[in-house]
Amino acid sequence: MRTRRVYLPLKGELSMDWHDYLGPLGRGAWVTIQFTLYSMFFGAVCSFAFGIGKLSKNPFVKGFSILYIEIFRGTSLLVQLFWLFFALPIAGDMMGIDLRLSPVVAGVLALSLNLGAYGAEIVRGAIQAVSPSQYEAATALNFSSSQALWRVALPQAIPEMMPSFSNLAIAALKDTSLVSLITLHDLTFAAEQLRNFYQDSTTVYTMVLLMYFGIALVLSFFMRLIESSVTRWRGHRR
């Protein structure tokens, strides 16, 4: 993912026309959309990995999954972002290891890990909500524990997860605004630059508000499409 710099006119070219804001805000919005999609993808991977891990019979896997979930649910996303970007390199220098992360990597990593911690609880809850009779039927068919999970529990649990994952997707979109604090040129960063230059807070932040709302509407629409597809897929399996 590449971020773009926001180019502003010279002060002699100062203009209060809202059309002048569209270019910088549009480029910032594209960065925001990319961060949202990346964090959703990697967050979903973490959700299933650690949600299933929390149900594991292996004490190490279960313990590590619980530790991850509690740490990232119990601490601020902003602090997690700052720790990865500012504190981790210092800790690495103390150990003689280069642990410096680019703003893009630090941003995606923090958003994904935080999203995954909340998603893991959704996955765990949906799997545990599957009727015990389904597991009994799987046992009667001589399924192993992993076969029962992948062939019986998950196909029934995934449709139940989708509404909650849709909410997490919207939360991920809004959380991307924090990456502006580590110098990433997202929509919020572009808005702050425009506000500082033009001193036109009302117009700039009204446009940003509408752009976030528009992105959220599109994201909600696609999440509903995915939810409908998953529901139809489940119906075909019956």
From Swiss-Prot:
Residues 29-223 form the ABC transmembrane type-1 domain. PROSITE patterns: ABC_TM1. GO terms for cellular component: ATP-binding cassette (ABC) transporter complex. The chain crosses the membrane at residues 33-53, 77-97, 103-123, 152-172, 203-223. One of its GO terms (biological process) is amino acid transport. Belongs to the binding-protein-dependent transport system permease family. HisMQ subfamily. The keyword DNA-binding does not apply. Probably part of the binding-protein-dependent transport system y4tEFGH for an amino acid. Probably responsible for the translocation of the substrate across the membrane. GO terms for molecular function: transmembrane transporter activity. It is found in: Cell inner membrane. It is a multi-pass membrane protein. Keywords: Amino-acid transport, Cell inner membrane, Cell membrane, Membrane, Plasmid, Transmembrane, Transmembrane helix, Transport. Coiled coil: none annotated. It comes from the Bacteria. Pfam families: BPD_transp_1. Its main location: membrane. InterPro entries: AA_ABC_transptr_permease_3TM, ArtM/GltK/GlnP/TcyL/YhdX-like, Ectoine_EhuC, MetI-like, MetI-like_sf. It comes from Sinorhizobium fredii (strain NBRC 101917 / NGR234). This is Probable amino-acid ABC transporter permease protein y4tF.
